Amino acid sequence: MFLDNYHHLKNKEIYVLTLLILFSIFIRVPVVFLYGDAGLENEWRILVNNLINHEILAFDYHDGNLAEFLFPNLYMPPLYAYYIYFFSTFSLEGQNYILTILFSQALLASISVAIFYKISKIFFSKTISLSISLLYSLFPLHVYACSQISSISLQTFLTILFFYFFFQFIEKRSFLLVFFVSFIGGLLILLRQEFVAILALSLLYAFIFYKISLKKILLILLISLITISPYLIRNIIVFETVT
């Protein structure tokens, strides 16, 4: 009897999560077609072209004699540039390439709604969680962002995923959850350097209010550091600085 009830509730939750994802995709696909970017522009075009042609994350630089140099990128976090570069490996060209990126962002945004629902259930009832998840799915900026060549959708997805695993870690404290929190935290630092502060505050919160052991806190910091270490090493070699 207990197992039957458990499976019924589990199937019902999967059904709700699936509907949230499908609903969110249904809302976003027309926006991608109507308002989606037509191509890579400005710094994204330069960075991706240099990754494709020279296998280096760099900007073009012209000196006074109009000689062209590649100037390695320092000030822009690298993750989103590599994200859009990844889709170029499928030999897609023109609008097909751009649409693939935008649809992938729409999918990530839709999945983030389902994850947001699971986080909401920690604090609210199922009805309230479903209502605020639908509102979140329909939030105009969240809908529009997936139609642009911008890191917002990827950042939102990873941030929500981070907090989902963070709350799971506070409750269960397993090594696997330590790894997920650390790795996703590292990816977010590679996407937005300001996330260092959020990661630090989150770990401080877990340490003070939930008595998470110092060993686990240090392990999270270590794995996060390992995640971002290739970029740090590259900056030290090229610029003799870590940022």
Where do the protein language model's features map onto the residues?
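Transmembrane-helix motifs of polytopic, lipid-linked glycan transferases
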Residues: 100-123, 161-165
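Loop-to-helix entry region of an early transmembrane alpha helix in multi-pass inner-membrane enzymes
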Residues: 74, 78-85, 90-111, 133, ...
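Short acidic/glycine- and proline-prone juxtamembrane loop motifs at membrane-interface regions
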Residues: 39, 141-155, 191
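Extracytosolic helix-loop segments that constitute the early lumenal/periplasmic catalytic or substrate-binding loops
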Residues: 40-72, 79, 87
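Short helix- or helix-capping micro-motifs
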Residues: 21-27, 132-140, 164, 185-189, ...
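Transmembrane-helix signature of polytopic, membrane-embedded enzymes
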Residues: 95, 111-138, 156-157, 173-179
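Transmembrane signal-anchor helices characteristic of membrane glycosylation enzymes that use polyprenol
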Residues: 12-41, 223-236
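Membrane-interface transmembrane helices that cradle and orient dolichyl/undecaprenyl
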Residues: 123-126, 162-178, 188, 206-210
